[in-house]
Amino acid sequence: MEYDAGDSAGAEESSAGGPPGTQYVQSLARGLDVIRAFDAEHPAMTLTDVARRTGLSRATARRFLHTLADLGYVRFDGKLFELTAQVLQLGYSYLSSHTLPQLIEPVLEELSAELNESCSASILDGADVVYIARVHTRRIMRVGIAVGTRFPAYATSMGRVLLAHLAPAELDRALAARPLVPLTPSTIVSEESLRAELAAVRGRGWCFVDQELETGLRSIAVPVFGADGTVQAALNVSTSTPAPSLGTQEEPLATALEMLPRLSAAAERISAALRARR
């Protein structure tokens, strides 16, 4: 949607564009859209780039960018805008006020040490998974992952675990929010096939993804249930495929399933802690 140059960037309240029956601050929503426009593929952008990615006019985008710069969230070198480290404080506010990452991190550290593999936890945000905890091994991984990293849920093991436990209407919205595009030759891009896989994931209680997000990356994930029985997060163990030159023969799923009992036990420890806090 294109907003004309006369649109106000102030803090007016409007129900237009907002959820029906709620108070909606349109200018705040636009400012957050500007922040979200920056990502791994677009770390630094011109004014025109930001306007294009947000659907705002150049005049409106300029006001938001310079406001964010005055507040310390954006820097401008005369040509390109980029986020500053101060943006991390927004995410830290969530992490520091939410008990889930605090419960998960020590469990992941133990699990990673036991398996000598990288372990992660994530939650669902729309059509994406967002990492809320991560423990790395010393192995070199082709995908750079840290707390706050977002990936399309449909192509990840944790994402599929989380999608699989959504109510039907919520799943419909999540799948409609993002097109299924091939990230690797192995990525499932048929909605019918994905829905069938999600049903299978829900039934068996775990998900294995083999090189669908990135070639060479495999992972297995399980859900973490809250005190009310709903899925609060997902845990996974990720591994990289052996280099072809090593001549290693392996059965990927069998290897992943060897780790499943410890992964499931870790998830149950977190679930038990959540139940105890009820």
What are these regions (language model features)?
Residues 218-222:
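Short hydrophobic beta-strand micro-motif common in sensory/regulatory domains
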Residues 82-178:
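Amphipathic alpha-helical effector-binding/dimerization core
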Residues 224-227:
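Sensor-regulatory modules in signal-transduction proteins
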Residues 2-7, 140-215:
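Short, solvent-exposed recognition segments
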Residues 1-97, 101-102, 268-276:
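N-terminal helix-turn-helix
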Residues 24-28, 84, 97, 101, ...:
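Short, structured helix-loop boundary elements
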Residues 204, 232-278:
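Juxtadomain coupling helices with adjacent low-complexity linkers
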